[in-house]
Amino acid sequence: MAISKKILPLLSIATIFLLLLNKAHSLGSLSFGYNNFEQGDERNLILQGDATFSASKGIQLTKVDDNGTPAKSTVGRVLHSTQVRLWEKSTNRLTNFQAQFSFVINSPIDNGADGIAFFIAAPDSEIPKNSAGGTLGLSDPSTAQNPSANQVLAVEFDTFYAQDSNGWDPNYQHIGFDVDPIKSAATTKWERRNGQTLNVLVSYDANSKNLQVTASYPDGQSYQVSYNVDLRDYLPEWGRVGFSAASGQQYQSHGLQSWSFTSTLLYTSPHYLKLGRFMI
């Protein structure tokens, strides 16, 4: 059947529109998953500091010896090599994202420290100086409480709780949101269980600007905390996602076992797309 010459331009416009829409979606989204880390996965990961990758053991963020005994004064991070679009300057829109991961903490002492954090930072983020210990590899202690000195948002799982020693920690083990400075904006009590896997879901809703964390152990014990935050106030337009962990004089190992992440930038309103003299 012949196609009318009047219909062809409309088909061309529709095709171009779909291609542009698909491109916009691909530029504004990121998705990856590691249910179990396998050989070759490290090609898409950036390891920093003392972090090591093993196909059989996952990612060990802080230093351990050949017997698995954790070291003192150690810090390590892992980031995904692909950048994520956090918001769009031209339209001022935000991204939705969801991260799922599991980790295990082990310590030969009762008061092991310091903790692990899921974080989002600028693409060129490196481990700050002197950040082993309580700042969890996220900031230099001298600028830890200076919002303008850091561009990072983190969900921390902090096992250190001697408040009088650093001035920012609550006096209990906790899950907390670190919005730029290291002091948590919102926290909930959390129990570190030596050698047990903690499964975590972190989600961000761009419409409500709500960041929520749900964590649980295999026996069903769960924890939840949420906080409203506008990513545009703290983070650049593009960033990287990853994990950071550290120990000071009190020590423990921090093993990342699985990690998946998805993000989608909310679609730009159709009137922003112009095709020739047509406004879609």
From Swiss-Prot:
InterPro entries, sorted: ConA-like_dom_sf (IPR013320), L-lectin (IPR016363), Lectin_legB_Mn/Ca_BS (IPR019825), Legume_lectin_dom (IPR001220), Leguminous_Lectin (IPR050258)
Biological process (GO) annotations held by this record are: cell-cell adhesion; negative regulation of cytokinin-activated signaling pathway
Q: Which residues bind a carbohydrate?
A: 114, 134, 165-166, 248, 250
Identify a single GO molecular function assigned to this protein.
cytokinin binding
Its keywords, alphabetically, are: Calcium, Hemagglutinin, Lectin, Manganese, Mannose-binding, Metal-binding, Signal
Specify which residues bind Ca(2+) according to the UniProt entry for this protein.
Answer: 158, 160, 166, 169
Which Pfam families does the UniProt entry name for this protein?
A: Lectin_legB
Q: Please verify whether the record's keywords include Manganese.
A: yes
On modification after translation, the UniProt record reads:
Glycosylated.
Binding-site residues, Mn(2+):
156, 158, 169, 174
Can the keyword Signal be found in this entry's annotation? yes
Q: What is the annotated signal peptide range for this record?
A: 1-26
- What role does it play? Alpha-methyl-D-mannoside-specific lectin. Has hemagglutinating activity towards rabbit erythrocytes. Binds to cytokinins and significantly inhibits physiological effects of cytokinin activity such as cotyledon expansion and delayed leaf senescence.
What extra comment accompanies this record? Answer: The hemagglutination activity of native and recombinant SL-I was not inhibited by cellobiose even at 120 mM, however alpha-methylmannoside and 2-alpha-mannose inhibited hemagglutination at 0.38 mM and 0.39 mM respectively.
Assembly, in brief, is: Homodimer.
| Record-stated family | Belongs to the leguminous lectin family.
* Name of the protein in question: Alpha-methyl-mannoside-specific lectin
